[in-house]
């Protein structure tokens, strides 16, 4: 089983027991986090796409670590002006281990079966 979730303006393809690094999330080590913005859910040859999200689906994870990314240097120089500026930035990151994927009541097979439209009946006179 896999799911595509959206968090921090990015999309992540996850499955159970995956470890992902996302933008900083509130919480301490060991806290549970839930991602409700599931874009796609699937597995075993079947998948469900959201429009834009799948209703009731969620992915649950556990915070492994709060850390900071590598230092990125921003250097600007104006030639012949004896002017320069050097700044550094480190992004706050959260390491999350995915513990479970929930389809939200409907499995991909059930969702595909329910999306089929019944044949139109003859109008009554």
Swiss-Prot record:
Kindly give the SUPFAM superfamilies that the UniProt entry links to this protein.
Answer: L21p-like (SSF141091)
HAMAP family named among the record's database cross-references? Ribosomal_bL21
Which keywords are on file for this protein? Ribonucleoprotein, Ribosomal protein, RNA-binding, rRNA-binding
Report the sequence similarity comment from the record.
Belongs to the bacterial ribosomal protein bL21 family.
Biased composition, Basic residues: where in the chain? Answer: 75-89
GO CC term (a single one): ribonucleoprotein complex
The record's function comment reads: This protein binds to 23S rRNA in the presence of protein L20.
Q: What InterPro entries has UniProt attached to this entry? A: bL21-like, bL21-like_sf, Ribosomal_bL21
Q: Subunit composition?
A: Part of the 50S ribosomal subunit. Contacts protein L20.
One example of the protein's molecular function in GO is: structural constituent of ribosome
User: Is RNA-binding there in the keyword field?
Assistant: yes
Provide the protein name.
Answer: Large ribosomal subunit protein bL21
GO biological process entries:
translation
A Pfam family cross-referenced in the UniProt record is: Ribosomal_L21p
Task: Give the organism, scientific name.
Answer: Methylocella silvestris (strain DSM 15510 / CIP 108128 / LMG 27833 / NCIMB 13906 / BL2)
Traced from the root, the source organism's taxonomic lineage reads:
Bacteria, Pseudomonadati, Pseudomonadota, Alphaproteobacteria, Hyphomicrobiales
**Comp. bias regions, Low complexity:** 106-125
Task: Answer whether the UniProt record assigns the keyword Ribosomal protein to this protein.
Answer: yes
Q: Which NCBIfam families match?
A: L21 (TIGR00061)
**Region annotation (Disordered) ranges:** 75-94, 103-125
């Amino acid at each position: 089983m896999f799911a595509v979730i959206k968090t921090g303006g990015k999309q992540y393809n996850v499955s159970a027991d995956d470890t992902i690094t996302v933008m900083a999330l509130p919480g301490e080590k060991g806290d549970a986090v839930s991602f409700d913005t599931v874009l796609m859910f699937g597995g075993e040859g079947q998948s469900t796409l959201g429009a834009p999200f799948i209703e009731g689906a969620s992915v649950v994870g556990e915070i492994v670590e709060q850390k900071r990314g590598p230092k990125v240097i921003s250097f600007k120089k104006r030639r012949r002006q004896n002017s320069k500026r050097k700044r550094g930035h480190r992004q706050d990151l959260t390491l999350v281990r995915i513990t479970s994927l929930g389809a939200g009541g409907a499995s991909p097979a059930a969702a595909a079966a329910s999306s089929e439209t019944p044949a139109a009946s003859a109008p009554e006179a």
